[in-house]
Amino acid sequence: MDARLLEILVCPICKGPLHYDRAAQELICNADKLAYPIRDGIPVMLVDEARQTVEGTPVDPAGR
């Protein structure tokens, strides 16, 4: 995922920062506990496509 793109993308709900999970190919919003998929290198920033992250499991902002 392009670092410049990550700098401009925000959560469509809260407008907060997103963190890239390289292993899962998702962009994570820790505030809303949502994970947005990346398909064929393209972030799918639709709320209907997002999945809930596991409650209480913090996502590493460094993408590790």
Swiss-Prot record:
InterPro entries: Trm112-like
Cellular component, GO annotation: cytosol
Superkingdom of origin organism: Bacteria
Source species of the chain: Burkholderia lata (strain ATCC 17760 / DSM 23089 / LMG 22485 / NCIMB 9086 / R18194 / 383)
Pfam families referenced in this protein's UniProt entry, alphabetically: Trm112p (PF03966)
HAMAP family, sorted: UPF0434 (MF_01187)
PANTHER family recorded: PROTEIN PREY, MITOCHONDRIAL, ZGC:162634
Taxonomic lineage: Bacteria, Pseudomonadati, Pseudomonadota, Betaproteobacteria, Burkholderiales
The name this protein goes by in its record: UPF0434 protein Bcep18194_A5877
Matches recorded under Gene3D superfamilies: 2.20.25.10
Annotated family: Belongs to the UPF0434 family.
